[in-house]
């Protein structure tokens, strides 16, 4: 599987693992559902599809989107979780080392909220990536207004 299918709608990715504390993983799943982020795992829990499905059902009671995609961990040089990534569509162009060009994405790691990650990326990233982060923050602000139908 390639990064291509993420290009159009997945500019916000949260890299996670079932080794993370359950309360943190549940909270990130809740935030991912609210913000439209996709949660990405490196592989199966206990090398079992059934165990992975069961763990995802327990952790993801809000219905956030999940995927198992080890290549994305490499593409975005993710070595710890949680890591938050904002990526431009051209992040799919992979270099010889299997990584996306540094100018096409920005990441931040740590036990922080998705909003804090987006705001930090907005302030620190290159202009194109900062613009994506700002647009995502604006959608979140609009969606959180009372009576909003923005998703």
Task: Locate predicted features.
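Non-globular targeting/processing and membrane-anchoring segments
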Residues: 1-13, 18-59, 92-151
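Thioredoxin-like thiol-disulfide oxidoreductase module
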Residues: 56-81
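A short, hydrophobic beta-strand/beta-hairpin element that forms part of a small beta-sheet core
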Residues: 82-96
